[in-house]
Design a protein with these regions (language model features):
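Signal-peptide-cleavage-adjacent N-terminal segments of secreted and extracellular proteins
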Residues: 13-81
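Intrinsic-disorder-associated interaction segments
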Residues: 20-27, 91, 115, 122, ...
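Exposed alpha-helical structural elements
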Residues: 26-30, 46, 97, 117, ...
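Serine hydrolase/lipase
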Residues: 2-4, 8-21, 81-84, 125-150, ...
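A conserved cap/lid and substrate-binding interface adjacent to the catalytic center
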Residues: 52-150, 168-176, 199-201
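Short, well-ordered alpha-helical microsegments
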Residues: 95, 159, 188-189
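Short, glycine/serine-rich, charged loops/turns that create anion-binding
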Residues: 92-93, 154, 186
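Gly/Ala-rich beta-loop-alpha elbow adjacent to hydrolase catalytic centers
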Residues: 151-155, 159
Length: 301
């Protein structure tokens, strides 16, 4: 049933009649479950449960990805019938890794192939995983296979940067490249966000309620753009932390039928009518953490 459903989703719901890319919640739920599976050393069971049929584990990667020998991981699921890959990146695994991420995120950003500046922890981690991913993209056997990239938290950041790198290198066209992430932090500066929006338009960042991680690292604020007492992120190209589009915000819950908002208002990528309008208070820190860990009713890690 799930396999047939997913087939229908990818063949019929890629774009609307106006040519605009569509967010589909059912697909997002499937990808969220696959993202949770990235925390397992054996994602085959997850693939078999979520994507029955001819879907299989094509490749799993795990490698030390920072100076503290913390490890990053990803896996690739493949369907030959659908001619499709799903590349799933794992999120932060340990508190030690989180500390390295935070330290690196507070430092300078690095140039990302001329598209803007990226968070060095994320770009360096991707560079460690890339030698295993790139041969799949080069393989002529799979040249007609479309790509969906996904991940939770750090995994979402890696998925976004990987998609941008794939587009910049011409491995896939925009129509054959899709990204859906969950609780993703900001991955780079304003210029990187705009480059991403141009090259990877079929992209959705799902945000659960008060999840704090999508608001990190903090952006520079625009004092002249204030909504409900909250300052908007500045669109100055010097802004070192800015989200790409499109946020999908679930303000109340993530059960079937719960409300979500497609956040396309100004500033693009940092819509002030969505999660950016929320005040963050230390007294609610446990709620922020819970909203980050749980997506669509299930623990994401």
């Amino acid at each position: 049933m799930l396999s047939l459903l997913f087939t229908n989703l990818i063949t019929c719901l890629a774009t609307s009649t106006t040519g605009e890319y569509i967010y589909n919640e059912t697909e997002a739920r499937i990808l969220s479950s696959l993202s949770a599976g990235a925390y397992s050393a054996t994602p085959t069971a997850c693939i078999n449960r979520i994507l029955p049929g001819d879907w299989l584990l094509h490749l799993r990667i795990e490698i030390a990805c920072d100076e503290g020998s913390n490890r990053c991981a990803a896996y690739i699921a493949r369907s030959d019938k659908q001619k499709r890959f799903i590349i799933v990146f794992r999120g932060t695994k340990t508190k030690k890794q989180l500390l390295y991420e935070v330290k690196k995120s507070l430092g300078k950003k690095g140039e990302f192939y001329g598209a803007g500046r990226a968070n060095l922890y994320f770009s360096n981690a991707l560079s460690k995983l890339w030698p295993e991913i790139e041969p799949v993209l080069y393989d002529r056997t799979f040249k007609d296979y479309s790509l969906t990239l996904t991940g939770h938290s750090l995994g979402g950041a890696l998925a976004s940067l990987a998609a941008l790198k794939i587009a910049l290198n011409g491995f896939r066209s925009s129509d054959d490249l899709k990204v859906v992430t969950f609780g993703q932090p900001r991955v780079g500066d304003f210029d990187l966000a705009r480059s991403y929006d141009e090259l990877v338009p079929n992209s959705f960042r799902v945000v659960h309620g008060n999840d704090i991680v999508p608001h990190l690292p903090p952006c520079d604020k625009n004092s002249s753009f204030v909504v409900g007492g909250r300052k908007a992120c500045s669109i100055d190209p010097k802004n070192v932390a800015f989200h790409h589009a499109t946020e999908v915000w679930y303000p109340d819950g993530m059960e079937p039928g719960d409300k979500y908002i497609l956040c396309k208002g100004p500033p693009v990528g940092e819509d002030m009518n969505c999660s950016n309008k929320l005040p963050f208070e230390w007294s609610k820190k446990f709620q922020y953490i819970r909203d980050h860990i749980y997506y669509f009713g299930y623990k994401a890690r």
